[in-house]
């Protein structure tokens, strides 16, 4: 970065984006914000972007979606966990409260280190289905940064359905959550079913109403691994780079 820092500056800051989760000084995983800057150098492995007077970002070249010229102004969007509505998962949750005289007001809540992605389904009656929802929302994905529901968001999960049986019908009609996904690894219908007799889960993949694959005897702590293998194409790790000026050289 020599030549890009003012002569009266004694130190500089740099931030490395290499696909590894960012951790705050308090030890929480954090989602980086998009930023703009100027490309000042490229190597076989990295792109260096000047983002401030003495601040720089280093991007893993293998992860960027576009490799611009040196000197180009760019907007960089590292991966951030998202909710099913497309909003960042660290967006404060809003709710409407009422004063003693009935006047409404808006409350924003943000828990440090929290980035939930709640399933867009109503609260079920079946306890086993409630537990499955809790596990999908709270258990980590294999990468250790996302929850399983973030993995579903990144795979394009939508059109959710549930099977919410009464206690006496739990074996005949197993509790289940179904959804469609559209990733490079799989496009079709995914169903996660609870198997009461084994106290385990099964995961089914359907395409055009035909069963493509079924994985049986999945324990709760293996759900993330099973879903990652079946539907996660890994594209969520990419660092999106958009040129605001300059000539495009390479596009992945």
Give the location of each predicted region.
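Preference for solvent-exposed, low-hydrophobicity sequence contexts
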Residues: 1-15, 66, 93
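Structural detector for short beta-strands of small beta-barrel domains
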Residues: 3, 13-44
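Negatively charged, low-complexity tracts enriched in Asp/Glu with abundant Ser/Thr
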Residues: 11-27, 118-184
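SH3/SH3-like beta-barrel fold
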Residues: 47-51
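Beta-strand/loop nucleic-acid-binding surfaces
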Residues: 52-67
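Flexible glycine-rich surface loops and low-complexity tracts that mediate binding to linear polymers
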Residues: 69-91
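Intrinsically disordered, low-complexity regulatory segments enriched in Ser/Thr/Pro
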Residues: 77, 186-220
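Polybasic, proline/glycine-rich intrinsically disordered low-complexity segments
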Residues: 212-251
